[in-house]
């Protein structure tokens, strides 16, 4: 409704929820006011021979019918895990969607975790936190190797994906602006209770 009176185009990466990570082709959808623009996009795809392949179309056609359910299930798993972390490690700062936004159907399944740190100086606190980040990630992937991965990903069919933006997606960002936090992506198919158990082990160790 907010964008119905202006030209709006939404692009979706096919490697995320549309295909569940099974292909890379993306697609865009526009409202009625973008018809003239969509025809130009179509022309561009044809001129550049950049249209999705038959196999990519097949994968998307098979996966798209379940996409909304997978998005909802992944969100519910993420919300469950976030709530657990909040209770077991109240000193952690968590960046995740609010319940109000989720009620409007904005349901991401990724959150950022700023672990509590300690030390006398800012430098000591930063060094400790960075070590703690790696300690948590290494524990998750060593204890749950079939589901936890140390990489950037989103919208996959199963498992959890752990990364530190400062050393992955923020490679070209100047050092002072990098985020040395933990970013976690949760899939619709996951043993969330096992993840809670391992996270509790981490909490008891620190």
Residue ranges and their predicted role:
Residues 1-9:
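Catalytic PLP-binding core of fold-type I/II PLP enzymes
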Residues 8-178, 186-191, 198:
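Active-site C-terminal subdomain of aminotransferase-like
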